[in-house]
């Protein structure tokens, strides 16, 4: 585990603590997480894994940019696409292009793990929220979402290693 991942985990712990202690769970919240049992700890794991995967996207963008001037436009596009493809603001489920592109973003799977942990489909039933199978409060949905975050981390890590090897060869 690198220093970047440690900072991501610490930041996730701070954000989760502020949200849980400051805001509380509120009425109607699920009593337990899907897999871990402790909903606060599971929410922390969701956010920490999402933060680590998002950090890998940042590393991939850094490897892609050839100069410092190129990185800012890439970051703007990456951040805006994360907002769109998470599925929280704009439903991506069953939308032909959005649904497929969302599979490449950590925000999609991070939001899905958190939605699965807090049972978002029960808290905000359709038609206000999409009937996304990845948001269901089941261990299968939660594990699939987590596995997708791991796949994204591995994929972007492989891309970064490939770009670094190309740069070293030149």
PLM regions with names:
Residues 4-170:
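Membrane-spanning alpha-helical segments of multipass transporters and channels
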């Amino acid at each position: 585990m690198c220093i970047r991942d440690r900072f991501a985990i610490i930041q996730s712990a701070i954000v989760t603590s502020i949200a849980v202690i400051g805001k509380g769970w509120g009425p109607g919240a699920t009593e337990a997480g899907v897999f871990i049992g402790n909903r606060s700890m599971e929410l922390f794991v969701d956010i920490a894994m999402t933060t680590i995967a998002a950090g890998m996207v940042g590393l991939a963008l850094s490897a892609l940019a050839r100069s410092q001037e190129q990185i800012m436009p890439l970051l703007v596009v990456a951040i805006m696409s994360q907002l769109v493809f998470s599925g929280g603001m704009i439903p991506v489920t069953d939308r032909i292009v959005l649904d497929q592109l969302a599979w490449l973003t950590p925000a999609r799977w991070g939001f899905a793990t958190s939605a699965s942990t807090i049972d978002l489909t029960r808290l905000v039933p359709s038609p206000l929220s999409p009937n996304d199978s990845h948001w269901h409060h089941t261990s299968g949905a939660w594990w699939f979402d987590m596995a997708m975050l791991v796949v994204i981390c591995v994929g972007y890590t492989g891309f970064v290693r490939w770009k670094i090897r190309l740069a070293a060869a030149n």
